[in-house]
Amino acid sequence: MTKNFDSTRIGTGTNEWAEVTENICRGCANNCLYCYAAHSANRFKLKDRGEWAKEELTKRADIITYPAREGVVMFPSSHDITPYNLEAYIRVAELILVKGNRLLIVSKPRKECVNEMILAFAGFEDQILFRFTMGTVVESVSAFWEPGAPLPKERRDCLDIAQSAGYRTSVSIEPMLQGFQMTEILVEWVRPFVTDTIWIGKMNKARLRVDNKHRAEVELIETLQNDKQIMSLYEWFKDDPVIRWKDSIKEVVARMSA
């Protein structure tokens, strides 16, 4: 069966969103403290954690054709779209789109990149969903956890830009960077600019992925996202048709409801 952007899928992580993932870059300027891709690259000796913010294109950036794929293609999944890789990103994305594929664009968006993409992808609007990630409305919290990424207001502005240009839009609040009440505020802050869905998920494996020097901040996240907080969040939004739950939330709900 052909999968739509928000079809129910079996699996966790990116498998909840797409059948296929693509990337053309190793490293990410956002340099998020909790990044799974940075942790994995360091673990498998592909790129030192301290070098993760230095972006480098991979051989996938040089492809000249792309096949028609069943389901949704998520591109990128382990890096972001930045001025460094924007030209290559647009070129590869167009290869994906011209074969009729549906493209899920996940990003902590920069205005300069979004403005270029909405022009470059004109005519493919029906095949694209922009899903922009933001975990808080608080600038200081965003700057701490995501030091190289755009601040929340710029990301919300990008939602407005994409929606106004006729594209479908979605938000990923994964990871949540605060607790129930601030996440509720964030949902309402972005809701006017969302055409499709808002996904919510916890910060995963923070003790494993975040440097030990930030242990106090990790412990605060764990407190703000304890089972009681998550259940309060779930009860608040459980009947909201726009809200979708990531696997980290579903696990808590299943366990607490047993």
Predicted regions and their residues:
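N-terminal [4Fe-4S]-dependent radical SAM core
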Residues: M1-V72
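Conserved residues at beta->alpha junctions
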Residues: R26, S107, D247
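Short aromatic-enriched loop/helix-cap "lid" or pocket-rim segments at secondary-structure transitions
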Residues: Y34, V210-K213, M256-A258
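Short linear functional motifs in flexible/disordered or boundary regions
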Residues: S40, F44-K47, E87, T183, ...
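Conserved AdoMet/S-adenosylmethionine-binding subsite of the radical SAM
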Residues: T58-L233
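C-terminal accessory regions of radical SAM enzymes
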Residues: I230-A258
